[in-house]
Amino acid sequence: MDYFTLFGLPARYQIDTQALSLRFQDLQRQYHPDKFANGTQAQQLAAVQQSATINQAWQTLRHPLTRAEYLLSLHGFDLASEQHTVRDTAFLMEQLTLREELDDIEQSKDDVRLESFIKRVQKMFDARLQQMVEQLDNAAWDAAADTVRKLRFLDKLRSSAEQLEEKLLDF
């Protein structure tokens, strides 16, 4: 059973996240291993496995990028273990330039410049995310997979910038 079916949701990118959370809580209560403490060893093991599956499904579907990756996996794209890389040279050069800029910001410890950088990267991420949503809605799986690969770069860059922000604030 796929994760969308497990939560009673349609297998599409845009989901009702409130319904997801409510169903997660219901499933957790229903399959919590403690409820099977007096059961057979097989029942206890099944409850632990089901609980782990429910938790993994929830973690996957609640985050936009992992939800997109999972949806693409249902259409034959194994982005988690694939060897495909981003082939868009302009995008890769832009990422290299942004990484260098982040390194410069770290060296200068310029928190104002860092704040501006984080906002700019977030805008880039949001624009790509919207592009990906449209591609998924239109079943443009190849294009969506490529956009997810690009979003991974931006997500990693954003995370690095936020870590630097925390580091600079600790001073």
Swiss-Prot record:
The keyword Lipoprotein does not apply. The keyword Chaperone applies. SMART domains: DnaJ. Keywords: Chaperone. GO terms for molecular function: ATPase activator activity; protein-folding chaperone binding. PROSITE patterns: DNAJ_2. SUPFAM superfamilies: Chaperone J-domain (SSF46565), HSC20 (HSCB), C-terminal oligomerisation domain (SSF47144). Residues 2-74 form the J domain. One of its GO terms (biological process) is protein complex oligomerization. GO terms for cellular component: iron-sulfur cluster transfer complex. It holds the Pfam family HSCB_C. Gene3D superfamilies: DnaJ domain (1.10.287.110), HscB, C-terminal domain (1.20.1280.20). Belongs to the HscB family. Interacts with HscA and stimulates its ATPase activity. Interacts with IscU. Co-chaperone involved in the maturation of iron-sulfur cluster-containing proteins. Seems to help targeting proteins to be folded toward HscA. This is Co-chaperone protein HscB.
